[in-house]
Amino acid sequence: MAQNSLRLVEDKSVDKSKALEAALSQIERAFGKGSIMKLGAKDSVVEIETVSTGSLGLDIALGIGGLPKGRIVEIYGPESSGKTTLALQTIAEAQKKGGICGFVDAEHALDPIYARKLGVDLENLLISQPDTGEQALEITDTLVRSGAIDVLVVDSVAALVPRAEIEGEMGDSLPGMQARLMSQALRKLTASISKSNCMVIFINQIRMKIGVMFGSPETTTGGNALKFYASVRLDIRRIGSVKEREEVVGNQTRVKVVKNKMAPPFKQVEFDIMYGEGVSKTGELIDLGVKAGIVEKSGAWFSYNSQRLGQGRENAKLFLRDNPELLREIETALRQNAGLIADRFLENGGPESEGDEAADM
């Protein structure tokens, strides 16, 4: 084995720039050109490419205008809270920009009719329904390494069942096997995801920890590895119902940015998810407009630039739906004031309130 040409030099008079140049050239000879560089040498390294979530409020709360590409994202929450809807809306937004998307349906529960209603182009959506967790993660790894995928969704971590568990009998105890599977897969995936600039969204479920006296008893499945590797973690909750007279037509939803490596975390935003429609864009623009002072609210009346939108929130939503030019004008004004909204108007729940919030649900 060849000896290293570099050695520790104790002489303080040595030229550091020459020593650094020698070290860099040795690293490049050993591992190839581009294995080490100055961060500012490539502008593309600094810029963060994003994909919209389909919710303007959530894009603002994330601080960078959407979910980051080349990163791992985790969306978790209780049942029927809107996890898959949010992931499908992100796929739809990526496809609008010409991106190629994939969906690893480990739960075998994807509804193509609902996905189409959310704006997903089913003809160009890659879908896989694997039999085991190992198969699902191998497919994920292969797609990511191809470098052709922009957004890949894995639904869900809880359904990634290890092969040994499937081949075993009911009642067999296999502690920690799923956590080990996820830990190994994420170790392999992380570098590939960054190099291919592919966003991988893991949807996760909630479980209860037994015997917890203080703090939140909730935890996510698949061990702790995903919590560490994820650049963004979103906690999505259903906080109420949207009604038309006596009929329930949607859910009021709250999303909290629990972890964010790209911008300040712990921001939270609320919006409506309408059945068969997805995130209510008009309702969200009205709410954000009122918070930013762009849309005026006087009693039950909503108005914009002295033009009345309607009496009551639902009537204002219908008016904006019938007037897309006015809707776009309000959206443009909100995007121009995105920094102001993020700083002043989005509720900012610190980490200490996370356990209390979970307990209130």
From Swiss-Prot:
Main location: cytoplasm
Functional summary from the UniProt entry: Can catalyze the hydrolysis of ATP in the presence of single-stranded DNA, the ATP-dependent uptake of single-stranded DNA by duplex DNA, and the ATP-dependent hybridization of homologous single-stranded DNAs. It interacts with LexA causing its activation and leading to its autocatalytic cleavage.
Keywords: ATP-binding, Cytoplasm, DNA damage, DNA recombination, DNA repair, DNA-binding, Nucleotide-binding, SOS response
Ligand binding (ATP): G77, P78, E79, S80, S81, G82, K83, T84
Organism encoding this protein: Sinorhizobium medicae (strain WSM419) (Ensifer medicae)
Compartments it resides in: Cytoplasm
Lineage: Bacteria, Pseudomonadati, Pseudomonadota, Alphaproteobacteria, Hyphomicrobiales
Family note: Belongs to the RecA family.
GO MF annotation terms: ATP binding; ATP hydrolysis activity; ATP-dependent DNA damage sensor activity; damaged DNA binding; single-stranded DNA binding
GO biological process, one term: DNA repair
One GO location term (cellular component): cytosol
Alphabetical list of CDD domains matching this protein: RecA (cd00983)
HAMAP family attached to this UniProt entry: RecA (MF_00268)
Gene designation per UniProt: recA
Name of the protein this chain belongs to: Protein RecA
